[in-house]
Amino acid sequence: MDSLPRNSPPRNSPPLNAPGQSPVAATLPLAAADRRGEWWKRRSALVAAAVFFVAMAWPFLRRGENSEFVVCYLRAARRLQAREIIHRDEPTAYAYPPAMAMLAMPLAQLPDETALVVWYLVNVVATSVVVAGAWRLLGGPPLTRLQGRWVAVFWLGVLLAFRFASAPLENQQFDVVIAALLVAGCLCLRRGRDLGGAVWLGAAAAMKCTPLLFAPYLAWRGRFKSACVLALVAMVLNRLPDFFWPQAGGLSYLGDWCGTFLAKVGRSAPGVWDSDLVLNQSLSGLVNRFAQSGLPGSAGPLPSGLAALSPETVAWIRCWTYGTSVALLALTAWRFGRPGQPWRAAGADARGDRDAGSSQIGLEAAALACLMLLLSPMSSKAHYVVLVLPCIAFARAYIERRDAWLRILLPVLLLTGPLTSKGLTGKALGDLTLAWGFPTWFALGLLLAVWRLLPAKQTETTAAGPLAGRVGRAA
């Protein structure tokens, strides 16, 4: 005799769902839809990256031979190859250390349009390294398999960082490459390869001085040899052009840069650089604009770096700029803990990795990224790509924690970060937000958040790893 499972309906009873449809068949479309939704969630980072790079190709390539990369960097590289002076006081001047021109020299051998396409591909790789490396530093799972709360963390990080991640691609600058070198160096530190990390960080410092902040940071953590290697790499890369392409008369490219541009920092009021003062979103630019006009109520006329300032005003700007800079450095050092302490172990991250000090290195690097922008003599929005790291740190903490301070900071960050895009606000209001220093306040807000996220005190877990921490607690 055939038997039916207990509590099952009779064979001849009408179906419980639609006519002619079994219960299993009714759930198949829902299951398929759930699988498709889960697939999109897991692959959302890859889809976002593909859309971003396709969308940014046109703004990057549209100016062709008139782009900033060609007019500034390739021109400097070709002058270097011809053993000419590369640091000149001219429109679209090359105002960076000579190492950047040397590294652009291979592309200077190509036609301008071809070099620009290759440079975009380099920036695509560098942007991928920045995002994936920062995500890894802060303990995120593989970006190809996002699920659960990590989907929300990723998209909140994208919302906060998108404006500043796209800015260097709009201007064809080196900032994404510098940020990639910084992230690569921090990843080496995370894995215990201190000297390798110092080499990557030194290469970044060779192209822009602000990454030199990592040298005293390494010394603070007791890595004196790594700090020396970082400074040595930065110096050697900037001296190589003098050996391979010496100028007639024995002049030094590095000396030319110091005399032409770096010396202006000492002669002028803080915030004055070879660009519009409104574009300078460093701390010195904010103080300089405030000293001239306070908070302007309209888009014009805006404060200018060419304004004749009285000696008293210049002294006031220097006092506030340098005093605030020292205060930010002191507070950051206090949050880092006592000098000489090793990195604390963070246990396993979302990948199952148990590298020592992973989250602490990521958070401390995020704080240094904010300081790099705030303490620099000149920081434009293109330089702000390094804030990808603190943006991800904030996004993860906001999603995972019930922290009232982070809840208060989020609308402030949204107002001063993503909403500064002139595509959203228009040129007049966009210029006004720059005059108010919205990006500067954005970096300050992120620095406050990172200070709050850093551990309050040294734990028993040391750089030897989680096992040592467990042994210490057992003892």
Regions found by a protein language model. Name each.
Residues M1-N7, N12-M56, T144-A152, L446-A475:
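Start-transfer (signal-anchor) and selected internal transmembrane alpha helices
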Residues T27-L195, R221-D349, D353-A365, C370-K381:
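Primarily membrane-embedded glycan-assembly and transfer machineries that use lipid-linked glycans
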Residues P111, A126, K208-P211, P390:
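Hydrophobic transmembrane alpha-helices
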Residues G185, G197, A204, L410-P411:
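Small-residue hotspots
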Residues L195-A219, L368-L375:
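Membrane-interface alpha helices of multi-pass inner-membrane proteins
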Residues G202, L230-M235, A365-C370, L406-G417:
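Central hydrophobic cores of alpha-helical transmembrane segments
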Residues S380-A395:
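Hydrophobic/aromatic-rich transmembrane helices and adjacent perimembrane loops
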Residues A393-R470, A474-A475:
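Aromatic-enriched
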